[in-house]
């Protein structure tokens, strides 16, 4: 879940009228409404109640993520120490790297407990920065898409919630101000780009879409949510399998729980 506990200065395409400080009442109401179904929530740790909210969500079994923030290095470190285990789409919607104002990115990559998300579409994050991210945090990068409803659809005009967006060349921007408003990326394409365009090993590319995100939620071992562990082709793991054409890195067949779906 992204929002509503985000920094106004890094809101991206989020409606500023909906942004809130995560006071205990809001946290408790959200946890009650989710009824155990909330897995991850992005929080700007510099908000007045940001660190306390991270602790509260973590104590409830939710994985807090640092993102959509303008946090300095020390505040981001406090967020991770309080229980945040993920950085939401690194480089996007946060203050960037600076040698005198390091910000949240070094805090995430220095902490071995933190899984670092990346949107590998060549647009949200340019290829040199994707490679830099993998160098920063080897075996801790998780591919995410930030995809919205126009994914796998033609270019044109769409709605993102109540917001008008335009999709041009597969890139999504708000019609009002041109701000990036999600993506049309699929995980298949993210892995494909990593291998064919960035030169990553198949192991590193596939791991970023499977085992690493599974580890972030504790799904790489027996757990009450998925029951069988996820993320590997190994005895005892869920029989969820993709068959990929190695020449073009496109998915050809899909099995879920050992049943052929495609």
Residue positions per predicted region:
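Electropositive phosphate-/nucleotide-binding environments in soluble metabolic enzymes
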Residues: 20-24, 44-47, 51, 98-102, ...
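Glycine-centered positions in the ABC transporter ATPase nucleotide-binding domain
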Residues: 257-258
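Divalent-metal coordination cores built from histidine and acidic residues
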Residues: 2-37
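Short, Lys/Arg- and Gly-enriched loop/turn segments at beta-strand edges
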Residues: 248-254
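Active-site core of metal-dependent hydrolases
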Residues: 25-155
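His/Asp/Glu-enriched, well-ordered alpha-helical/loop segment
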Residues: 103-116, 134-147, 151-244
